[in-house]
Regions:
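Short cysteine/histidine-rich zinc-coordinating motifs and their immediately flanking basic loops
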Residues: 58-62
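Inter-heme linker and motif-flanking segments adjacent to c-type heme-binding CXXCH motifs
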Residues: 54, 118-125
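Electrostatic cytochrome c docking/interface patches
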Residues: 22-40
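Bacterial N-terminal signal peptides
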Residues: 11-21
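Extracytoplasmic electron-transfer domains, predominantly the class I c-type cytochrome c fold
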Residues: 63-118
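Bacterial N-terminal signal peptides that target proteins for export
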Residues: 2-13
């Protein structure tokens, strides 16, 4: 027979394991979200930020400041998820980055930001 103390400990341990697995799962980006982000990026962002995410486009020659280079070495420390979502949602003052909050849903904005981070920023050294 199991003691009440051991039973309580096992229940708490089980709860913690379930909680941690739920937290870990919430940080996983479903494939469909990445696919949606890719679609949005190529339709709406690529013209300024480029196919490679480096901002080397015709737009870079005519916009000041030039579009953000998502492949630069300093970009990971410069751009957090929160800052990127805010920039896409509200736009960036004194730049050509327009607000997308009336065009894209919150889920679409998060999908495109996740795509940018995964595609262009995750391989930074």
């Amino acid at each position: 027979m199991t003691s009440p103390k051991k039973t309580t400990t096992l229940k708490i341990l089980g709860f913690l394991i379930l909680s941690l697995s739920t937290i870990a799962a919430s940080h996983h980006i479903p494939t469909s979200d990445i696919a949606l982000g890719k679609k949005i990026y190529h339709e709406r962002c690529e013209v300024c930020h480029g196919n490679l995410g480096d901002g080397k486009t015709f737009a870079a020659n005519v916009l000041f400041p030039p579009p953000k280079n998502f492949t630069s070495k300093s970009i990971k420390t410069e751009l957090s998820l929160k800052k990127m979502v805010r920039s896409v949602t509200k736009g960036r003052p004194n730049t050509a980055m327009m607000p997308w909050e009336t065009v894209l849903s919150k889920q679409e904005i998060l999908s495109v930001v996740n795509y940018i981070q995964q595609k262009f920023m995750s391989s930074q050294k």
